[in-house]
Amino acid sequence: MLHTTPSGLLIIDKPQGVTSFDAVAAVRGALHIKKVGHAGTLDPMATGTLVIAFGHATRLLNAIVAHDKTYEATIRLGLRTTTDDAEGEVLVDDEARSRWQTLSAQLTEGGQSGEPTALPTASWQDLLTRTIATNFTGDIEQVPNTFSAIKINGQRAYDLAREGKEVELKPRPVTISEFTVLNIRSGFVAGEQAAEPLREDANTGAIPALDVDVRVSCSSGTYIRALARDLGNELGVGGYLTRLRRTRVGRFALPDDASGLIAPEAMLDTRTHTVTAHTDQKTFTNREGQTVTRNKCVLDTPEGLAGDERRNWLLDHALTMEQAARGAMPALDITPEEASELRFGRRIERTISEPTAAIVPQTHDVAAIIERANAHQAKPVTVFPLA
């Protein structure tokens, strides 16, 4: 059956264990649409908000990528890893352990150097609050993680790092509007696996550690792994990320977003449009004739739906082109006549100060993205066909 190509956004709650591209592939396959993309990569270990555009809405992605974001994460203090997250190898640092004992003596009564000590969470709460307020809020400079997708002379930083080559990344300005400590758990780890859970008992050789649950709202381009690393370095005890969930991208939020940064009047209906997904496995034979098993992303739809029925269900849960445009950037209501002018590449008599979606509200027609031409006129920079 032939389909007209629809346009819109799907808000996917990405599961752990798959890449953002895996989620895009799942949407592409389910909707039978080639033109699909996402607004901001989530690492395989991360979960949460992945804004996926299809059809003409892919031309809104550049605007959405630039939006600020909210994350909920767990930072483990007391150790370091090679990747600054739980997917790397644990680095046991004698200097960091010595610093932990110094903090233990300072924050507890009778803390003795050389003994593994789990610090009271109340003492940590005050120390963390002061450290974060002083060093990790507002406008800061952040050095991205070595294992990141940033390109250096055409090569990804993580590829260079895996090859054992030295990677030097320059600090970047980012803005942290919120960095809140939500919960603290104190305990011990063996230090053999980065993802191992905390335990209460201190066996021989146990390493004291602290798991800190945080919520971070930040500008685009902020690395939460780098925040975990830098917080641990500032305290002198080491730190890395063990959990990461993105709850909000601009005005696109998951039902569990608790940032409170989206005003009720600006709230999009993304909470009822979110599509969950889960991780499964697929097995295939590669070009070398080898049998390969890897993870894949599977969109959660009602049981029994397949083909066109499953496609239509997903489209019903997608944001329309108009909703997508209004969520992606400022919007301006225009007349049908102005829409026609814009589609011919002509200017309209409107005063704007930033890139804006020009929409005919009566017909929900997104005509163009416009920008300031002069003090009294706006010009089209991206034109959309009449749906």
UniProtKB/Swiss-Prot annotation:
The active site is at D43 (nucleophile). InterPro entries: PsdUridine_synth_cat_dom_sf, PsdUridine_synth_N, PUA_sf, tRNA_psdUridine_synth_fam2_C, tRNA_psdUridine_synth_TruB, TruB_C. The keyword Glycoprotein does not apply. It catalyses: uridine(55) in tRNA = pseudouridine(55) in tRNA. Gene3D superfamilies: Pseudouridine synthase, PUA domain. The keyword Isomerase applies. One of its GO terms (molecular function) is tRNA pseudouridine(55) synthase activity. Keywords: Isomerase, tRNA processing. CDD domains: PseudoU_synth_EcTruB. It comes from the Bacteria. SUPFAM superfamilies: Pseudouridine synthase (SSF55120). Its EC number is 5.4.99.25. GO terms for biological process: mRNA pseudouridine synthesis; tRNA pseudouridine synthesis. HAMAP family: TruB_bact. Responsible for synthesis of pseudouridine from uracil-55 in the psi GC loop of transfer RNAs. Belongs to the pseudouridine synthase TruB family. Type 1 subfamily. This is tRNA pseudouridine synthase B.
